[in-house]
């Protein structure tokens, strides 16, 4: 179990970034497998424990960076969820958990998954849309680990992974973009059609098809036969296109001065101000409308605090448990979390000033 203070330090690092409204968030993942072991689906529990011990030992030897090894079987559910939320990791940790672990750095930007889909996944998050710098950090860590570990590699297929499409560079690059105006105007699908063979689209929650808070997640479909630089360059081009279209859509909404939009924004403020219970969908959708209103200068925060960026994470149940519950009595029980979520949004909504 990770001490609460360390977990709090890790999860609050994102609050220090005063990101612009449109700035995307990116995550990068490099998958690796030990050359001396079978792929994860073929491993026994004992073999998985051996892989975990081998890899974890190397992280403890890395100088200049403090890492925490967290076996999943010993990690409370709420801490697992909190870490996955913070790093925007698309993994389901409800399996056997034996021989599986997360390894996180003190800075709150790097995470390694052991025996999840592959023996090792090096994962990082970038809050200021500088994925090239994040990639270099992951590559440096990968090179350091390869000094002691031999990863499965083929001259023809690159790094070998459980999923054949993820061979090659074995890089998955994701961009999370807030696109409320495009969704409202039903313009998003036509923008994405030319890129559907190269990038997959999903929501904030990888196992859900529901759009949460008007967040679009783009990720490359294949890493075989393309370099890391090519993947990031293509992702930047698509994201830039979407951001330009979102800006244009917001300007049109502002010009139209739509009563319907204003009504949705005002109803969202009312919901966050007066609700006793809020599920995640309701809370993020309402927050998205409010953030849209703030970007159009129809709403102002009396304390000049950013709203969307912290709330993007802080309304999810792992973060709610961390920040709002007694250390000895943490729970992610649905009704309790819904009540805490409503209590969290109320003071945020009450300090908003209407300019419409």
From Swiss-Prot:
It comes from the Bacteria. Residues 22-249 form the Phosphagen kinase C-terminal domain. It catalyses: L-arginyl-[protein] + ATP = N(omega)-phospho-L-arginyl-[protein] + ADP + H(+). Keywords: ATP-binding, Kinase, Nucleotide-binding, Transferase. Catalyzes the specific phosphorylation of arginine residues in proteins. Its EC number is 2.7.14.1. GO terms for molecular function: ATP binding; phosphotransferase activity, nitrogenous group as acceptor; protein kinase activity. Belongs to the ATP:guanido phosphotransferase family. InterPro entries: Arg_Kinase, ATP-guanido_PTrfase_cat, Gln_synth/guanido_kin_cat_dom. Pfam families: ATP-gua_Ptrans (PF00217). This is Protein-arginine kinase. NCBIfam families: PRK01059.1-1. ATP binds at residues 25-29, 172-176, 202-207.
């Amino acid at each position: 179990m990770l001490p609460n203070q360390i977990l709090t330090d890790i999860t609050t690092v994102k609050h220090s970034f005063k990101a612009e409204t449109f700035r995307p968030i990116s995550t990068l993942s490099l998958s690796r497998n030990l050359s001396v072991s079978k792929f994860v689906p073929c491993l026994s529990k004992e073999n998985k424990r051996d892989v975990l011990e081998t890899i974890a030992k190397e992280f403890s030897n890395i100088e200049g960076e403090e890492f925490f090894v967290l076996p999943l079987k010993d990690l409370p559910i709420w801490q697992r969820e909190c870490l996955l939320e913070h790093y925007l990791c698309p993994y389901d940790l409800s399996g056997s958990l034996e021989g599986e672990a997360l390894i996180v750095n003190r800075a709150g930007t790097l995470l390694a998954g052991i025996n999840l889909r592959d023996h090792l996944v090096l994962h990082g998050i970038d809050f200021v849309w500088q994925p090239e710098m994040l990639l270099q950090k992951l590559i440096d860590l990968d090179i350091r680990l390869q000094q002691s570990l031999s990863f499965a590699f083929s001259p023809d297929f690159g790094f070998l992974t459980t999923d054949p499409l993820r061979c090659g560079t074995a890089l998955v690059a994701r961009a999370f973009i807030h696109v409320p105006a495009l969704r409202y105007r039903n313009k998003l699908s036509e923008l994405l059609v030319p890129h559907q063979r190269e990038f997959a689209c999903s929501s904030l929650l990888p196992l859900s098809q529901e759009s949460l808070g008007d967040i679009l997640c783009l990720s490359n479909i294949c890493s075989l036969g393309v370099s890391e630089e090519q993947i990031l360059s293509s992702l930047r081009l698509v994201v830039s296109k979407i951001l330009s279209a979102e800006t244009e859509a917001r300007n049109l909404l502002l010009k139209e001065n739509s009563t319907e939009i204003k009504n949705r924004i005002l109803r969202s403020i009312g919901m966050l101000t007066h609700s006793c219970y809020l599920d995640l969908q309701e809370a993020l959708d309402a927050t998205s409308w409010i953030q849209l209103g703030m970007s159009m200068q129809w709403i102002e925060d009396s304390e000049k605090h950013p709203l969307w960026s912290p709330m993007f994470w802080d309304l999810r149940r792992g973060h709610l448990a961390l920040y709002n519950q007694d250390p000895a009595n943490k729970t992610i029980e649905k009704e309790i979390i819904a009540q805490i979520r409503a209590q969290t949004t109320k003071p945020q909504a009450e300090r908003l000033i209407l300019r419409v």
